[in-house]
């Protein structure tokens, strides 16, 4: 336990919480332009070709973003919306692209969990 004199000389430090998504700068989403669209393989126990794009955000950050869902229409210079949320088996991928907004199309033929993939309600 610190004495009162010690606390007067050097007060207690506040613990600063580190952000999981620093590039968003406390915003819910950010807009950006794709600089590279590619596939990459996940960490050890899993096996797949995960779709990822490198995005230059409007605030100057350059981040990797995961493209969820089956099939996508993104290419270089596509304008995308980025939200937070990491992909556990892809190191360095801490953001998701928002499907169905800006240049990103929704997932075709999706009937369940449609709101997460930007799919309109089937007639």
Swiss-Prot record:
Xref: Gene3D superfamilies: Nucleic acid-binding proteins
Gene Ontology molecular function: rRNA binding; structural constituent of ribosome; tRNA binding
Assembly information from the UniProt record: Part of the 30S ribosomal subunit. Contacts proteins S8 and S17. May interact with IF1 in the 30S initiation complex.
Swiss-Prot/TrEMBL keywords: Methylation, Ribonucleoprotein, Ribosomal protein, RNA-binding, rRNA-binding, tRNA-binding
Entry keyword annotation includes tRNA processing: no
Function: With S4 and S5 plays an important role in translational accuracy. Interacts with and stabilizes bases of the 16S rRNA that are involved in tRNA selection in the A site and with the mRNA backbone. Located at the interface of the 30S and 50S subunits, it traverses the body of the 30S subunit contacting proteins on the other side and probably holding the rRNA structure together. The combined cluster of proteins S8, S12 and S17 appears to hold together the shoulder and platform of the 30S subunit.
Keyword rRNA-binding: yes
GO annotation, cellular component aspect: small ribosomal subunit
Biased composition (Basic residues): 111-123
Region (Disordered): 100-123
Modified residues (3-methylthioaspartic acid): 89
Protein name (record): Small ribosomal subunit protein uS12
Protein family (similarity comment): Belongs to the universal ribosomal protein uS12 family.
InterPro entries in alphabetical order: NA-bd_OB-fold, Ribosomal_uS12, Ribosomal_uS12_bac
Phylogenetic placement of the source organism: Bacteria, Pseudomonadati, Pseudomonadota, Gammaproteobacteria, Pseudomonadales
């Amino acid at each position: 336990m610190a004495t009162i004199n010690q606390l007067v000389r050097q007060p207690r430090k506040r613990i600063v919480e580190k952000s999981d998504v620093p590039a968003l700068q406390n915003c819910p989403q950010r807009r950006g332009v794709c600089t590279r669209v590619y596939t990459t393989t996940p960490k050890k126990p899993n096996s797949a070709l995960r779709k990822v794009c490198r995005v230059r955000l409007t605030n100057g950050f350059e981040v990797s973003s995961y493209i969820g869902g089956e099939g996508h229409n993104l290419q270089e210079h596509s304008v995308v919306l980025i939200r937070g949320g990491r992909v556990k088996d892809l190191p360095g991928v801490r953001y998701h692209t928002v499907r169905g907004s800006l240049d990103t199309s929704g997932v075709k033929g999706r009937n369940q969990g449609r709101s997460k993939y930007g799919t309109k309600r089937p007639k």
